[in-house]
C-alpha cells in the first residue's frame, strides 16, 4: 500500500532525528502518518525532530492535527520539532491555522 512510504529516509544525526514525509496527507492516510511518527518517537527521544515536507504538496486539517500531536510529544520530552521545505499550499494552511510559528 501507499501508506508504507509516507515516512522515508529516517536517520539520526547526533541527537536529531531527520525524516522525509511523502505524498498528500489527508483523512485517509493521516492515521498512518500518526502511527509512523509515534512509533519513531517511542523508539527514540530526539532533542530535535526535523521533518522534510518537500514532497508533500497538500495536507488537510487531520494531518495538521497529527503534526501538532507529534510536536506535543516531542516537547514533553524536552525536544523541538522543525518542519522544513514547506510547499506553498502546506505553508498557507499552517498560516491559516496560525501554526507556522510553532514549528521553528
Where are these regions (language model features)?
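Amphipathic alpha-helical interaction surfaces in cytosolic regulatory modules
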Residues: 24-103
Amino acid at each position: 500500500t501507499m501508506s508504507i512510504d509516507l515516512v522515508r529516509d529516517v536517520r539520526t544525526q547526533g541527537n536529531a532525528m531527520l525524516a522525509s514525509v511523502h505524498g498528500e496527507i489527508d483523512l485517509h492516510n493521516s492515521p498512518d502518518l500518526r502511527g509512523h511518527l509515534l512509533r519513531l518517537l517511542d523508539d527514540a527521544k530526539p532533542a530535535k525532530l526535523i521533518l522534510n515536507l518537500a514532497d508533500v504538496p497538500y495536507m488537510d486539517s487531520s494531518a495538521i492535527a497529527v503534526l501538532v500531536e507529534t510536536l506535543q510529544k516531542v516537547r514533553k520530552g524536552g525536544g523541538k520539532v522543525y518542519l522544513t521545505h514547506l510547499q506553498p499550499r502546506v505553508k498557507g494552511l499552517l498560516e491559516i491555522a496560525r501554526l507556522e510559528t510553532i514549528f521553528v
